[in-house]
Amino acid sequence: MSARWTTAVLDPQMTGGLAVARSPEGFLVDANGALFPRDWLKRQDLDVLCEHGIGHFDGQPVFLLELRSATDVPGCSWRGLRAFMLEGDFDTYKVLGYAAQIGTWAREHRFCGSCGQAMTQIRWERAMYCQPCDLRSYPRISPSMIVLVTRGDEILLARSPRFVTGVYSTLAGFAEPGESAEDCLVREVREEVAVEVRNIQYVGSQCWPFPHSMMLGFHAEYAGGEIVMQPDEIEDAKWFSVHDLPPLPAGRSIARYLIDLYVARRLGCDIPAFPS
């Protein structure tokens, strides 16, 4: 959360404020960005699936218009969420990241997972409700760990087949039922590269709205084993010197922060700011 942006449950029946429009193609933008006067946005010919009040930005209420499909709006275009993460105002990215998570949840929870009937939006909390089942569905958050494995002046980096060509990153994976974050870390490192770790140190967390992860970041020391890459998950993995690193993840990601923080400490450089 930032001083400019705070989340809140707002009643869509209230008037005024700002709004963002999200479709399967991304967020609607114009020359001024992705936040529009709400009254103007609702006058456009948009295929609205639902509307949610999501918080306040610079003191103004903000609403999400979740759309069934993209619509041409004069002077506007559609832009994916990752583009906002990589460049531009990080506070706006936080608004849109939250909006994307709420939009995904609202789209996926229109019907009860137990009986199949339509669910209704609760006005006073972030939940969808099935009256026959007395069942509430809340926005999904998927906890996952992300870890930089270290060995003195070397760090273990890997690349997935899904990565941008040449980029290496830290190891990561989702927590399983019954696991602590530390249990998940040990298992995922063992599964992905077949090495063991020790001295696990928590560093920080980051919301990762692609679509609904909570990344718990760690440093861990190498304890033994030879790298054996997990088929289909890891395309390459190797040890890199802190003096000679490959192309790395985006600067606003916790993956990049874990790397930059360790390198700064080893080289005696200034500690980087956390991407919060």
Curated annotation (Swiss-Prot):
Annotated Nudix hydrolase domain residues: 139-262
Presence of keyword Magnesium: yes
Positions of substrate binding: R82, E125, Y138, Q206, C207, W208, P209, F210, P211, H212, S213, A255
Cofactor note: Divalent metal cations. Mg(2+) or Mn(2+).
Protein keywords: Hydrolase, Magnesium, Manganese, Metal-binding, NAD, Zinc
Matching CDD domains: NUDIX_NADH_pyrophosphatase_Nudt13
Keyword Isomerase: no
Motif (Nudix box): 173-194
Protein name: NAD-capped RNA hydrolase NudC
Protein encoded by which gene: nudC
